[in-house]
Curated annotation (Swiss-Prot):
GO terms for cellular component: extracellular space. This is Insulin-related peptide 2. It comes from Agrotis ipsilon (Black cutworm moth). It is found in: Secreted. Residues 1-19 form the signal peptide. Residues 20-43, 67-86 form a propeptide. The modification Arginine amide is found at R63. PROSITE patterns: INSULIN. Its main location: secreted.
Length: 86
């Protein structure tokens, strides 16, 4: 168990170092592994309140139908951008 925690911390440090270097391309297996690493332990969005569908659509804006592949494989992205997909 301790091995997995240490391994996760090492990977997190590696991700932090790569984010300091700027942006990178993440595609395929590398994208899924990096997302899993970045999102590991991240808190899920609050589901404690409910918004009617009409109001939710009005609040949407933002990303539209773009996903992590559009953001990180077709153009470079940072770890901070990847965190928005957790």
């Amino acid at each position: 168990m301790k091995f997995y925690i240490v391994f996760a911390l090492i990977l997190a440090c590696a991700a932090c170092v790569s984010s300091q270097e700027g942006t990178n391309f993440y595609c395929g297996r590398q994208l899924s592994r990096t997302l899993a690493l970045v999102c590991w332990g991240a808190e899920k969005r609050d589901a404690g309140w409910w918004v009617p569908p009409q109001s939710a659509r009005a609040l949407g804006g933002g990303r539209g139908k773009r996903g992590p592949v559009d953001e990180c494989c077709l153009k470079p992205c940072s770890i901070e951008e990847m965190l928005t997909y957790c």
